[in-house]
Amino acid sequence: MSRIGRLPIDVPAGVDVAVDGQHVTVKGPKGELSLTIAQPIRAEVQDGQVLVTRPDDERESRSLHGLTRSLIANNIVGVTTGYTKGLEIVGTGYRVAIKDKGVEFALGFSHPVYVEAPAGISFTVEGVNKMTVVGIDKQLVGETAANIRKIRKPEPYKGKGVRYAGENVRRKAGKSGK
């Protein structure tokens, strides 16, 4: 039995979990998320807990069991507290500012780069070189932060670029002069 999959998920007060066949809908104070679970896996709500079960011990069922339980648990955390991902902009002249429904970056290109916030995502900017991606969907928050980081990844010589908050950039030594 999957060690993660067999653990029941506690449903906190103020959160409503509805299971309709293979569709799980989670409603909470921050919003609503829905999830379609894979075919052999079943989910049910009992006594304020969500139980995820699998019908057999086939390889596919075992792999989907823990995944499904984690996805449902992530949705419950998302609608109660939400998710954040911090980004730091490092480099001379590199900056970020909120503009319309997104953010605008100056990252050393000949033009500013504008990133619009996807539905369900908001940006907060602290100063000119720190920002946070905020949302209730863990996967969408991480994907949006990764897409922003991809615009200008931290380079290994000076460390300039967009990095995650707390990320260590492996630095290389430059050319040694004569």
From Swiss-Prot:
Coiled-coil regions, chain positions: none
Single Gene Ontology MF annotation: structural constituent of ribosome
Single biological process term from Gene Ontology: cytoplasmic translation
UniProt keyword list: Ribonucleoprotein, Ribosomal protein, RNA-binding, rRNA-binding
GO cellular component, one term: cytosolic large ribosomal subunit
Disulphide bridges: none
Subunit structure: Part of the 50S ribosomal subunit.
Protein name per Swiss-Prot or TrEMBL: Large ribosomal subunit protein uL6
